[in-house]
């Protein structure tokens, strides 16, 4: 949410409104903390919650990934990781965390009453071909480095109009929308339709022009009501408009993202560690250090994205960053493909967060 590394994903993980600045957020999608919190992190003695952690196994796997792929990050947090794993193995009663010598820090949230923003991002799978043919006519570009040194890179509209040399084309997809979403997410797996392994395209750079949220544009134009804005609402708008109208909308966002083919087969965050779905997050590293363990109280949604007035407790690790992930905001990595895209599109809610570390 440095992101040159595979999920730069979030220099541009601006997905929900195609920007994580979200035009509309209802504070009632979270809950109110009774006592006002002043500091970013307030040390507390105990978390009075009896629910169990639902992702203990995934948390263990994520810690092992850190140990293997970033030994230095693991060493910085080794005591915390080992203590939390010991706690999970014994009983994982949240109200007993302090008995294991773990410091507990309540985050003040965006409103000073504990409400932190919860959103999601994912890795898309894009159908593409090496050669332009039939519906596969939308170029995915590599970074034109020679232009970057000598002159400003073209705006999105100019790139759509073919101003870049064809030698920079990595592949052709069959959907301009998929290309745009790929840019927003910062990376994607490419399916060439040959029954071979998917190829990972990671973030290579951008053209340097300012990003503009298409969700906000649609709200400003009155195409979608502010209260109804969601990824699903944007998709519905797409189905009712022509390719030309969709392209015109995209062109209002002059920012453009370039990619590079990589040999890596896992999705990495800014910490150079493979991300485990629903156990890794992008966070603001001016508040949350990379490798930090966060206990999240997350809203539970139904299959239509409706908040059920229930919460689940999940342990996550801050392994990613994002240009739009600022302050008391966590962007949860949801995984790869369609199911992950739906879930990440629904999350625009509030929860609670506690930072855990060994005393």
UniProtKB/Swiss-Prot annotation:
<dbReference type="GO" id="GO:0071555">
    <property type="term" value="P:cell wall organization"/>
</dbReference>
<dbReference type="Pfam" id="PF06725">
    <property type="entry name" value="3D"/>
</dbReference>
<dbReference type="InterPro" id="IPR005300">
    <property type="entry name" value="MltA_B"/>
</dbReference>
<dbReference type="GO" id="GO:0008933">
    <property type="term" value="F:peptidoglycan lytic transglycosylase activity"/>
</dbReference>
<dbReference type="GO" id="GO:0019867">
    <property type="term" value="C:outer membrane"/>
</dbReference>
<dbReference type="GO" id="GO:0009253">
    <property type="term" value="P:peptidoglycan catabolic process"/>
</dbReference>
<keyword id="KW-0456">Lyase</keyword>
<dbReference type="InterPro" id="IPR026044">
    <property type="entry name" value="MltA"/>
</dbReference>
<dbReference type="GO" id="GO:0009254">
    <property type="term" value="P:peptidoglycan turnover"/>
</dbReference>
<dbReference type="InterPro" id="IPR036908">
    <property type="entry name" value="RlpA-like_sf"/>
</dbReference>
<dbReference type="Pfam" id="PF03562">
    <property type="entry name" value="MltA"/>
</dbReference>
<keyword id="KW-0961">Cell wall biogenesis/degradation</keyword>
<comment type="function">
    <text>Murein-degrading enzyme. May play a role in recycling of muropeptides during cell elongation and/or cell division.</text>
</comment>
<dbReference type="GO" id="GO:0004553">
    <property type="term" value="F:hydrolase activity, hydrolyzing O-glycosyl compounds"/>
</dbReference>
<dbReference type="InterPro" id="IPR010611">
    <property type="entry name" value="3D_dom"/>
</dbReference>
<protein>
    <recommendedName>
        <fullName>Membrane-bound lytic murein transglycosylase A homolog</fullName>
        <ecNumber>4.2.2.n1</ecNumber>
    </recommendedName>
</protein>
